[in-house]
Design a protein with these regions (language model features):
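Aromatic- and glycine-rich beta-strand/loop motifs that create alpha-glucan
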Residues: 1-21
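Long, hydrophobic alpha-helical segments
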Residues: 72-95, 192
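A structural motif at transmembrane helix-loop-helix junctions in multipass membrane proteins
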Residues: 164-196, 204
């Protein structure tokens, strides 16, 4: 069953990977010409116009835009978090539900396979695909940055790991939500909404101090990129919270799926 599931999801994984790497390839091809011209000075001057809170939200107050690595630490990781977050959310909402949507659940029910086993195999495929996307993007960025110029390797490796934390929570959240419906069309919009709202909450909590508490309702807070940039270390608390939330949502998914009336 694992091979069947992995083969079924490989095409979408490949498409997401190619598109993601293509976006960053364009950046690495274009950025040398940008930093070699007067555009850098214009960008630096433009940065002075923005309020400190806005710069802080995108880490532009602690990362210079005069290099590809500086861009990656600021605007670049916005793309990284959103792309991987959207992929994880969509995968979580579809991977378990597609059997009902495609009317193949009857075939699985005819096999001597427990529902818990079905969930375990699908979750394993999801975790492998998400981890591979994070890993491949990290390797690609490493090659791109090596060609572009000097950068802090340890800091980069830690930064490359951080998108995995919100992605796992988003995956398990959308997986759990999918156990309440029978159609993938319903969960697709919900999963994308969760990802975007989660990112907006995290951004607002950084920009405005009165709503700083909103970060506790966002999965992207778990990435804690600013902490990695400043201290060159991953906050252990974020790792613990990610594990606890993922396990809790996983167990709830199994419980709900075993009770669900499959159609």
């Amino acid at each position: 069953m694992f091979k069947r599931e992995y083969k079924f999801n490989f095409k979408s994984f490949l498409i997401w990977t190619v598109i993601t790497l293509g976006i960053f390839l364009l950046v690495y091809l274009m950025y040398p010409s940008i930093v070699a011209s007067d555009n850098v000075k214009m960008i630096d001057e433009m940065m002075k116009v923005f309020p400190p809170e806005m710069l802080k939200a995108f880490n532009m107050d602690i990362a210079s835009m005069n290099s590809a690595y500086g861009w990656l630490k600021s605007e670049g990781f916005v793309f990284v978090l959103l792309i991987i977050g959207c992929y994880a959310g969509i995968l979580g909402s579809n991977i378990l539900l597609k059997e009902e949507n495609d009317k193949t659940i009857e075939y699985l029910n005819s096999l001597p396979i427990k529902r818990t086993t079905i969930v375990l195999n699908k979750v394993l495929v999801g975790l492998i695909n998400i981890t591979l996307l994070v890993l491949l993007l990290g390797i690609f960025n490493y090659i791109g940055l090596t060609i572009s110029g000097d950068f802090d390797i340890k800091q980069f490796i830690l930064l490359s790991i951080t998108p995995l934390f919100p992605a796992l929570v988003l995956f398990f959240t959308c997986l759990f939500i999918s156990t309440f419906t029978h159609k993938t069309k319903k969960t697709l919009g919900i999963s994308l909404g969760i990802v975007l709202i989660s990112y907006i909450l995290q951004t607002l909590s950084t920009i405005a101090e009165p709503v700083e508490f909103l970060k506790y309702f966002s999965a992207f807070t778990l990435a804690d990129i600013r902490h990695v940039i400043v201290d060159v270390s991953i906050n252990p608390l974020m790792v613990i919270i990610t594990i606890l939330l993922s396990i809790s949502l996983f167990l709830l998914t199994i419980f709900n799926y075993n009770k669900k009336e499959l159609v």
